[in-house]
Amino acid sequence: MSKNIKEKIAFWIFRLLSLGVLLILFWILEFIFVRGWHMLSWDFFTKMPEDGMTKGGIYPAIIGTLYLVAGSMLVAFPLGVMAGIYIHEYTLDSFFKRFIKLMTNNLAGIPSIVFGLFGMALFVNYMEFGDSIVAGSLTLGLLALPVVIRVTEEALIAIDDSFRHGSYALGATKLQTVRKVILPMAMPNIITGLILSIGRVSGETAPILFTVAAYFLPKLPTSVFDQVMALPYHLYVISTSGTKVAESRDMAYGTALVLVLFVLILNLLANALRKYLGNKVKMN
């Protein structure tokens, strides 16, 4: 068999495998969409749950999810970006740097339920925040932290060293170079990674199960020390352990579809924002 034929066979094998992945994705999306699209309405997005979660809407769960996402990003974004800058720009290639990277990768691989238990032990019990938005946001922020660190590192690695050397040649300090030259160029990829990490955080159930999520609340939270409803936990409860699981099946599929659409919108937003910021950097 000639080398050309082998390459064609390998090409078609990889193409079929890629198509297989896409088919699985479309099958999952089709499964959720067909069963959940009829639930999407203005009332579904703006009303409180009613009649044992079988009627009404998911408004408090949407608001709670947005609160938790915003709070977690307030924790993960500044800490993760600063840590990524320090690791890549300020530490030499030494055992210490490799150790930090190893620990960051290990932190990213820890199961989310372990983060939930840690958050419950530290934020809920030891720091006495109780089941609250603060405890949930801090826990989710720690969960997203290694992702933001790695994204920042990769964005900085992608910047050619000639820009750094040129800045130093003009008399700029290390801090000025990072702040005025490197960080603006890396920001499109950093923001993209941040938005994608929001998609992961918004779908986590285990961490909020131990730190903030409530089965049902009659009103929206008025303080960061209140509990909230959240979409992933809401979906889990009405699908497995609610009082009327069979009757709330349509509500569950509708909630799942909202979560999928939320992540899809975040991905589209990430791509659009990366292109916009990239063009802005090129123009400057």
Q: At which residue positions do the language-model features occur?
A:
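Transmembrane alpha-helices
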Residues: 73, 174-212
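Generic hydrophobic transmembrane alpha-helix motif, especially the helices
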Residues: 105-142
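Interhelical loop and adjacent transmembrane-helix boundary motif
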Residues: 52-56, 208-260
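Transmembrane alpha-helix signature in integral membrane proteins
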Residues: 56-86, 194
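C-terminal transmembrane helix and the adjacent membrane-cytosol boundary/short C-terminal tail
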Residues: 153-157, 161, 168, 195, ...
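Amphipathic cytosolic juxtamembrane alpha-helices at the membrane-cytosol interface
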Residues: 79, 92-96, 164-192
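Transmembrane alpha-helical segments of polytopic membrane transport and secretion proteins
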Residues: 1-18, 270-284
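Transmembrane-helix boundary motif in ABC transporter permease subunits
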Residues: 3, 72-104, 117, 125, ...
